[in-house]
């Protein structure tokens, strides 16, 4: 899927017409103490929406972000959908530190002791400026379970749907630019039209998608009416976070920050600024944040609240260096205890994926190494309206299922019991057909370059039973935390992954797909057959789907493992909230950005109600 830089577009999204003030007026002065109504740490999936909602209602907001503009740091490798796989592989040496935190996990025992690069956006927009732009809702049953687990019905599916829709600005697909047999079906009643975040279907659907619809049907995954009404089991085209006009990435930056920059000076952004620690008065009242810009430390104080939205890794780190977390962890680094919350940094959950690759008789991202192909792709993208392969991330149709009965024979009783505890509509596997070659996922740009086009059927474990941790390596937040996802630590995840691999093969052997493959399986190849051989391959070739969450979990106040209550307020202190993926009680099936946007809208309303 390697695509070249298209430099013409690298700064287009920075154009801000009809300004009320110079753009620079929206950015803070490094080294100068300042007072605001609210200080928000992290300008990502949740932090940017919260800052927007507070600022638009007249409150002053300091938004602290360690990164800067992804348009500068990554250019079109961030903006153009087809480039979104750059720099997100497992190889720690293949990253872009201008836009990435360069997180590397501790050695993963079940992945051959590999230390894995965990791509994470260090930019305005956070990982919404780096991800694959896949957008859909979780299942109804999973959010109903969320409400049950936290003892608050306001978090169930029916009550959260309006907040998710509040964030959405859905544009129907331009079916005149898509193949006639690639028309998505969807329910307009569950898609918002007046929100900030652009969601749509890309102007190009790969020709393989229509074959995949039939292939999914052949193996028992019926086509369903979109992925946004609380149902996932089946198959459907997925929405993407794409701006419909220019077909650029839509992120929390484009949705919630760009509209305010140079227009609403209630929001002041401190970019390239690290949050060092949360400050407290009277021991437990949060009053501000000590920050650092280019080595200059200063204080941003909050009249009302401090809101941490730094993500599943940096949020627990910031809490711990500020004195909130497991007492024993803090004692190791001489950090004074503010609140003993043993759940901080615990319960890390994530999705993993891997899949076989095939040569196919169709155009895929493998053709991007052909100069003539790229030239034509650029011409189409530069047209009005933009069209062609560059408008598509390379993943546009998804499939979901519980593992079929015939593949559950090797599941242990422990695995069956754990999976049986999930809601009935919760799929155990997600299938992501990727129009290119995955290989061992160390570097997605490494392909055979043999003149053939490839298709990979990646299977993701979306019912993870393994649990990991995040810990501090120092009392300094500029030293990355210790991240231990413990992927495959629970044998059930390996058992489900084996089943997913076999089902990926079954899809490609289906009557619908058999006619488009050229030869047999290219990777890992037909020598990998037994469960033991598949497991050995999975340990080498699996990667994260980058859905880390749950490290500062929401729950009842009387539960000692709860870190926040159902309004995002940190238990044991006052004036401090968390609003990001870390407070999710568990990881729902699928891609979580929709629920994180909804979570941000929901808690922003709570903050304003308490103002």
Swiss-Prot record:
<feature type="binding site">
    <location>
        <begin position="592"/>
        <end position="593"/>
    </location>
    <ligand>
        <name>FAD</name>
    </ligand>
</feature>
<dbReference type="InterPro" id="IPR012132">
    <property type="entry name" value="GMC_OxRdtase"/>
</dbReference>
<feature type="active site" description="Proton donor">
    <location>
        <position position="547"/>
    </location>
</feature>
<dbReference type="GO" id="GO:0044550">
    <property type="term" value="P:secondary metabolite biosynthetic process"/>
</dbReference>
<protein>
    <recommendedName>
        <fullName>Oxidoreductase cicC</fullName>
        <ecNumber>1.1.-.-</ecNumber>
    </recommendedName>
</protein>
<feature type="binding site">
    <location>
        <begin position="131"/>
        <end position="134"/>
    </location>
    <ligand>
        <name>FAD</name>
    </ligand>
</feature>
<feature type="binding site">
    <location>
        <begin position="45"/>
        <end position="46"/>
    </location>
    <ligand>
        <name>FAD</name>
    </ligand>
</feature>
<dbReference type="GO" id="GO:0050660">
    <property type="term" value="F:flavin adenine dinucleotide binding"/>
</dbReference>
<keyword id="KW-0325">Glycoprotein</keyword>
<dbReference type="InterPro" id="IPR007867">
    <property type="entry name" value="GMC_OxRtase_C"/>
</dbReference>
<feature type="glycosylation site" description="N-linked (GlcNAc...) asparagine">
    <location>
        <position position="282"/>
    </location>
</feature>
<comment type="similarity">
    <text>Belongs to the GMC oxidoreductase family.</text>
</comment>
<dbReference type="GO" id="GO:0016491">
    <property type="term" value="F:oxidoreductase activity"/>
</dbReference>
<feature type="active site" description="Proton acceptor">
    <location>
        <position position="591"/>
    </location>
</feature>
<keyword id="KW-0274">FAD</keyword>
<feature type="glycosylation site" description="N-linked (GlcNAc...) asparagine">
    <location>
        <position position="76"/>
    </location>
</feature>
<feature type="binding site">
    <location>
        <begin position="65"/>
        <end position="66"/>
    </location>
    <ligand>
        <name>FAD</name>
    </ligand>
</feature>
<comment type="function">
    <text>Oxidoreductase; part of the gene cluster that mediates the biosynthesis of cichorine, a phytotoxin active against knapweed, corn, and soybeans. The first step in the pathway is performed by the non-reducing polyketide synthase pkbA that condenses one acetyl-CoA starter unit with 3 malonyl-CoA units. PkbA also catalyzes one methylation step to produce 3-methylorsellinate. The nonribosomal peptide synthase-like protein cicB, the cytochrome P450 monooxygenase cicH and the O-methyltransferase cicE are involved in the conversion of 3-methylorsellinate into nidulol.</text>
</comment>
<feature type="glycosylation site" description="N-linked (GlcNAc...) asparagine">
    <location>
        <position position="113"/>
    </location>
</feature>
<comment type="pathway">
    <text>Phytotoxin biosynthesis.</text>
</comment>
<dbReference type="InterPro" id="IPR000172">
    <property type="entry name" value="GMC_OxRdtase_N"/>
</dbReference>
<dbReference type="Pfam" id="PF00732">
    <property type="entry name" value="GMC_oxred_N"/>
</dbReference>
<dbReference type="GO" id="GO:0062032">
    <property type="term" value="P:cichorine biosynthetic process"/>
</dbReference>
<dbReference type="Pfam" id="PF05199">
    <property type="entry name" value="GMC_oxred_C"/>
</dbReference>
<feature type="binding site">
    <location>
        <position position="581"/>
    </location>
    <ligand>
        <name>FAD</name>
    </ligand>
</feature>
<feature type="glycosylation site" description="N-linked (GlcNAc...) asparagine">
    <location>
        <position position="410"/>
    </location>
</feature>
<feature type="active site" description="Proton acceptor">
    <location>
        <position position="547"/>
    </location>
</feature>
<keyword id="KW-0732">Signal</keyword>
<feature type="signal peptide">
    <location>
        <begin position="1"/>
        <end position="20"/>
    </location>
</feature>
<keyword id="KW-0560">Oxidoreductase</keyword>
<feature type="binding site">
    <location>
        <position position="123"/>
    </location>
    <ligand>
        <name>FAD</name>
    </ligand>
</feature>
<dbReference type="InterPro" id="IPR036188">
    <property type="entry name" value="FAD/NAD-bd_sf"/>
</dbReference>
<feature type="glycosylation site" description="N-linked (GlcNAc...) asparagine">
    <location>
        <position position="475"/>
    </location>
</feature>
<keyword id="KW-0285">Flavoprotein</keyword>
<dbReference type="GO" id="GO:0016614">
    <property type="term" value="F:oxidoreductase activity, acting on CH-OH group of donors"/>
</dbReference>
